[in-house]
């Protein structure tokens, strides 16, 4: 499956529908600098190599499901492991599945993934992800539609890897990050603007 290329006068974006609708390249054209981590030329486009991309989305849940099992609606739900490098299931199905291209223009693309609910996550749903370039910004939106006859809880995550350097910074008035270990997750407020900077690119 070919890669999708979007661009305007400032930015270039490359997406792999086959590899979980992940971003393989996102760069500043004028400065010739990568904003997201570029996909290595030594790696092949396969579903498990999305870990080496610059971004993927997580649907219908984000994070680790320990022991591949969770309790919901008075019963235990057993999930399949999503990635061979992970000891537990993680991040849902979307990041390791093929997505279909619904629409594409020079500066935008819309991709769809449908989970039938017959294996792993037990409910049927459709995820629609839209990428669009607007001047110096990349906008990503995800819409998840319940196609099942039963309601279910879900969570959507955006998982980028920024191409940073020792001088990198993030400029934000309200930024937090999740620190996790085997036992729990802790959300921390960023008190210093000197953590990251995305190679001094201004990213919205």
What is the predicted function of each stretch?
Residues 10-15, 129-131, 138-146:
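Short, well-ordered beta-strand segments enriched in hydrophobic/aromatic residues
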Residues 5-7, 71, 75, 80-135:
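Extended, loop-rich substrate-binding clefts of extracytoplasmic carbohydrate-active enzymes
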Residues 34-52, 77-98, 169-180:
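Glycine-rich, pocket-lining loop/helix-strand segments that form or immediately flank
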Residues 151-153, 161-204:
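Active-site/ligand-binding surface loops and adjacent short beta/alpha elements
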Residues 27, 125, 139-171:
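Acidic (Asp/Glu-rich), glycine- and aromatic
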Residues 16-19, 121-125, 154-155:
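Short glycine/proline-enriched turns and hinge-like loops at secondary-structure junctions
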Residues 36, 94, 115-122, 148, ...:
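Hydrophobic small-molecule pocket/channel-lining residues, especially in calycin-type beta-barrels
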Residues 1-80:
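Beta-strand-rich N-terminal accessory domains
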